[in-house]
């Protein structure tokens, strides 16, 4: 990014401060923050968004439940209610981003030329009217003139975040009311995006719910400097408010719906044991990464294109760090791993970096196992990895959601996470993985276990049974120790030529270069030196 952009960014924030000063009331004390619930259903045939509102509700166990909603933007969306006017905002769930932000009603476009000195090969970006139509008509944008929103008391008044698909947002750090299914979270801090760059090749992001651990992004101070900024995460804010007792959460996703539980996980969704895998250690890592030891391809069919009547399993050594990321749609693995998988079906790796095979080279019983060690093996059907089928005179061709990843960023996205139950506990440096109960649904009765309790007796390599030997009390506060949110999915699609369509949030970013949309640029010190050079 060029230095003039950051001068411009500070000016833009100063202008924003002047224009909205009268809209803010500095009320002493902490704000009450609550999240209301809304559920939407996914139409598999039409592949279109449907929104069906439901009332606030609590699970029979007493835990608050928040439904997420399906959209066509390639992600899982949570409905977060903010403001004294209690409006609902659809925000992308992202385990690779720390900050929760929402788009402002008066959002204006950033052009590529305002951000980058060299714009060769860079999309010019969407116009202001286009962004407002996509973000504020299809979703809900934040209107700070009709709510009790106010700036935070921090000296860092603004934030700047850039993502792997080049999406860039600039805005204010805010405090306002929020609503969590009958629970109040005092003084909820979030970002309000007032300027945004979106490529015309991808869907507009209406906002993000950041589920990663706290990490440093770019901030803008009240004395007009670019500074390092570590925003409070939504998980940490729930802990600080004594709503949950541990900064951990469990995630259940499938093609239609899903569920996010802060502070706990749902035993009813799990078949067998939870396998606890160590988070990969790194001095600068702040992502939910684990070591993937190997992949096993199990073939069990014959076809017109593959002559062998019976094929044995093929073990492929990987032994590399991979990041679990709900903000990423596909699976990104080392180049030689992807090529080995393609070879098992006499397929190829396309120029776009994904596996292409004949559809009759596999059966419904074929699967790929992801092996994390200590019997932590999880199967994904090859059929479930198909993102597009193309008719051909020599036989239908299937494109798989397996991509060659960038060497600095191997990712297990939604095409993996839909087939496991995942639990994230940064403090314990553990990620729990479990096979899904085939009868699990987000509407079934919850059987919630506290993550802290589950991990007390766990050591490296051990698993925790989904059926506890002792009953555990999880009503640690008057609110309980877990929050339950449910989700619905947003699949991406692939065009006939194999390139990702604009429905995917990774279309021109992660899909082409293997970089997650959630990979925030963390370079504040560099920006300061550029600004004052």
UniProtKB/Swiss-Prot annotation:
Residues 1-23 form the signal peptide. GO terms for cellular component: endoplasmic reticulum; external side of plasma membrane; plasma membrane. CDD domains: pepsin_like. InterPro entries: Aspartic_peptidase_A1 (IPR001461), Aspartic_peptidase_AS (IPR001969), Pepsin-like_dom (IPR034164), PEPTIDASE_A1 (IPR033121), Peptidase_aspartic_dom_sf (IPR021109). It is an enzyme of class 3 (hydrolase). Residues 76-434 form the Peptidase A1 domain. It holds the Pfam family Asp. One of its GO terms (biological process) is proteolysis. One of its GO terms (molecular function) is peptidase activity. The keyword Magnesium does not apply. Glycans are attached at residues 79, 106, 138, 153, 166, 271, 278, 299, 319, 439. The keyword Methyltransferase does not apply. Belongs to the peptidase A1 family. Involved in degradation or processing of the mating pheromones. Its loss may cause a persistent response to the pheromones. It may cleave the mating pheromone M-factor. May be involved in processing of zymogens that are required for zygote formation. This is Aspartic proteinase sxa1. It comes from Schizosaccharomyces pombe (strain 972 / ATCC 24843) (Fission yeast). The gene is sxa1.
